[in-house]
Amino acid sequence: MPHPTDANCRSCHSDAGAMQASLQLGRKLPAAAFDFRPEQGRVLFKAPRPERGYTKIIHRFATDHPEFQVLAEKLKDPDTLHFNHALHLTSPNIAPLKSRKLDCADCHKPDAAGVYHLKISYNDHCQNCHSLQFDVHNPDLPVPHGNAGHVRDFLRSLPEQYADYGAKKGIQGRRELETFVQEQMKQIREQAGSGGELERRVFFSDARTGPVARIGLTGGLGAARFPGCAYCHEVAPSGGEVPQVSSPVLTDRWLIRGRFDHGKHFKVACVFCHAAERSRESSDVLLPSKQICVRCHSPQGGVADDCSTCHSYHAPRKETVAAR
C-alpha cells in the first residue's frame, strides 16, 4: 500500500460530512473495536475514548490539530510508585552520583534502536542510593526486594538469616555462631522492637512520621537508610496475610496512536520537552504540549509536520505493526 499523503488524510479528516458519518458509525460499534493493537512487551497508556471519538476536523498539525488528549483532559500517570523528579534533579540534599548531580540519562537510557528507552529497574537505577539495609549493624544483609512474601519469610526467619550471614562472614563453630545470632537478634529488637513490630515497620513505615521512621541507618555518601516499603510503594494490610505491595507500572508509550523516535531528537535537551525539574508528583504526565512540538514541527519551525510524520494509516499491514 502506498504511503498516505496529507491530501489522503484530509480527504476524510478535513471533511465535516465524513467525520460526522464516522461518528455515527462509531456509536454503533462495540468499544472493543477501537482497542489499539498491543505491542508485545510494552506498557501502553490507554486514554479513554472521547465521546465523539477522533472526529475533530483537522487541516494541519500547527493550526487545528487538538492538544494531546492526555494533556487536554489532564489525565494522570497510573503508576503508584512514589517518585519526585524535581527532588532527584534539583535538591541539594541528593548525594552526587560519581561526583555530579543526577540527570535524566542516569535513569532513562535509549534502547539499541534509539527509539524507546530501556526498562527502569530497582537493581539498575535505585539501589545505589536507596538501599535495603534494615539493620545498621549488618549492612550486608538486606531485605529482599520484589516479592512481599519473600520479605515476610525473611523477617520471620531472621535467626536462620543471621546464622547464614555469620557463616559467610567466617564465623566458625556452633557455639560462636549461636552467640552471634543471639547478639544480632537482641540488637535488632532494640532497634525496632519485637518481630511483629519489625515486620510492621518494614512494610508500612514511610520514613515521614514518628519513631517508625528509623528502621536502620547506614553511613556513607549515597547509601541511604531503608525507610520502609511504603516510602516508595503503596502498601495495604491484607487481613493477616502478606501485605499487598503495589508493583510499579512504568508506561513505555503514552501517545499510542502516534509514534515518536527519541533518536531523531537527541540534540534537543530533555528539559526542553519534559518539565521534570518542576514535577513533584508521581501522577504527573511529563509529555510536551502540542505547542512545544509546533516550535519545530510547523512551516515556521522548518521541520516536517505532515500527518505521516507521527501517524500511520488506520489499518497497517501486520508486518508494519510488528516493526513499529
What does each model-identified segment do?
Residues 1-324:
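Short sequence/structural segments immediately N-terminal
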